[in-house]
Each structure stands twice: as structure tokens, then as C-alpha cells.
């Protein structure tokens, strides 16, 4: 039985991933978080509390015993309060997670990034996502998954105006997003979570980058998982 560690459990995708464990799985799920989620957890899901993700020793200790890392950590510049604070979370924490998981000989690291992420992007947000991706790829894991979803659909516990507007547009005018723009169509958080689960339960030894439409395709191909 493999042990999957999940960070970013209280976000939209993190919660969707947890809900997948309401069904029997040949795997153990452990959440590593600052506090226990305020929603009911499936039976058998463990929570390890860590007050400071920047305490490297404490972080590595909390991650001990895992095989696969599911990283759904991500905030917004508005919520973080500044670009510097955002960078500290969306790059700094991921760098430390990758380092600890590598030192603990994890087999896989699976990270939810963003569509159009690139270290060469002129957009600060997307550049940070690209840097986080690079920090993971530089480590020698057997399996690496980088997921780059477009706008996420689902019931988020926190209100994000930009996402709400985007969700409304995507629901009413999806036919505008055709050809090269098809990749920007919204995607269900549950679909992203399923892709993460399939990859974390895989025995493949590879590095895969999934653009938003590829996440949907991969999930469909593994529908009987």
C-alpha cells in the first residue's frame, strides 16, 4: 500500500482529491496542513499539523513515511497581500516540499500549476508558477506530474471574484473558445483531482506535463481506474 501526502487540502482541488478517498483505495492518505480542514474527512484519512511550512526540519518530519506528494498549494496575490508574500508561498513552499520529498526518497511529486505558466512569462503570477515547476523538475523523482488547468469549476469555500466572472462566461459562452482558444475552456476541479489520483497510483516512471485539455483526455482514458 502506498502512502499519499496531500498539501493544499483546503483548496478546491485539494478537497476534491480528499473526497475521492470516500471510496475504498489501496492507498493511505495523509494531509499535511496548518490546521484540520473544517469539512468532514473520509474514514481513515490522517491529518498532520505543521504550524510553519518554512521550518524545514518540521516539514521533513511531517512528510516522513510518504511515497507520493500531491501539491495543491496556491494562493493569489490579493489574498497573500503582496507579490513578495505570494512568491514566498507559491514558490518558496513548493521548493521546500520538493527538497524534503527528494531527501525522503519519494517516488512521485504531482503539482497543480496554472495554464500558461512559464519562467519566461512577463506575468508575475505565471512566472512564479513556472519557477515552482522548475524546482520540482530539478529533483530526481521517479514520477513527476505538472498539471496546468485553466479556470476551475466547482464550489470553492472562499470567494474569488475573478474566478466567479470567468465561470459565468465559460458557462454561457463556451462556443467562443474554439481552435487555439479551446485550451482556455474551464475544467471541473473533480477532473483535475482524478488526474492527480491516477498519476499518484501509477507505477510509471516518467515526467508528464498536462495542459488543461490533456487533463480531461487522460482522465477519460483512465475512467475505469
Locations of the language-model features?
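Short glycine-/acidic-enriched loop or helix-start segments at secondary-structure transitions
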Residues: 15-17, 41, 80-81, 120-122, ...
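Conserved Rossmann-fold NAD(P)-dependent oxidoreductase catalytic core, especially the SDR/UDP-sugar
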Residues: 12, 30, 35, 81-83, ...
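Oxidoreductase cofactor-interface core, primarily capturing Rossmann-like NAD(P)-dependent enzymes
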Residues: 9, 24, 119-208, 213-219
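Active-site beta-alpha turn of Rossmann-fold NAD(P)-dependent dehydrogenases/reductases
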Residues: 73, 110-113, 150
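Structural motif
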Residues: 3, 67-68, 108
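N-terminal Rossmann NAD(P)H-binding glycine-rich loop of SDR-like oxidoreductase domains
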Residues: 2-25
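Short, catalytically relevant binding-site loops at active-site mouths
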Residues: 37, 76-77, 115-118, 152-153
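NAD(P)H-binding glycine-rich loop region in Rossmannoid oxidoreductase-like domains
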Residues: 37-38, 42-96, 100-103
Amino acid at each position: 500500500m502506498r502512502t499519499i501526502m496531500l498539501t493544499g487540502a483546503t483548496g478546491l482541488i485539494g478537497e476534491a482529491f480528499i473526497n475521492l478517498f470516500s471510496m475504498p483505495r489501496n492507498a493511505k492518505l495523509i494531509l499535511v496542513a496548518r490546521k484540520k480542514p473544517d469539512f468532514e474527512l473520509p474514514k481513515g484519512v490522517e491529518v498532520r499539523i505543521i504550524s510553519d511550512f518554512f521550518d524545514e526540519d518540521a516539514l521533513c518530519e511531517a512528510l516522513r513515511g510518504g511515497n507520493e506528494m500531491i501539491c495543491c498549494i496556491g494562493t493569489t496575490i490579493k489574498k497573500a497581500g503582496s507579490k513578495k508574500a505570494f512568491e514566498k508561498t507559491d514558490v518558496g513552499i513548493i521548493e521546500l516540499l520538493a527538497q524534503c520529498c527528494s531527501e525522503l526518497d519519494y517516488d512521485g511529486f504531482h503539482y497543480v500549476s496554472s495554464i500558461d505558466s512559464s519562467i519566461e512569462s512577463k506575468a508575475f503570477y505565471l512566472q512564479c508558477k513556472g519557477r515552482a515547476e522548475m524546482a520540482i523538475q530539478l529533483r530526481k523523482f521517479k514520477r513527476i506530474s505538472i498539471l496546468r488547468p485553466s479556470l476551475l469549476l466547482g464550489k470553492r469555500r472562499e470567494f474569488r471574484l475573478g474566478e466567479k466572472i470567468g465561470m459565468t462566461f465559460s458557462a454561457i459562452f463556451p462556443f467562443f473558445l474554439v481552435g487555439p482558444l479551446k485550451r482556455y475552456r474551464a475544467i471541473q476541479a473533480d477532473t483535475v483531482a482524478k488526474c492527480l489520483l491516477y498519476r499518484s497510483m501509477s507505477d510509471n516512471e516518467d515526467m508528464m506535463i498536462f495542459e488543461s485539455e490533456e487533463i480531461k483526455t487522460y482522465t477519460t482514458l483512465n475512467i475505469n481506474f
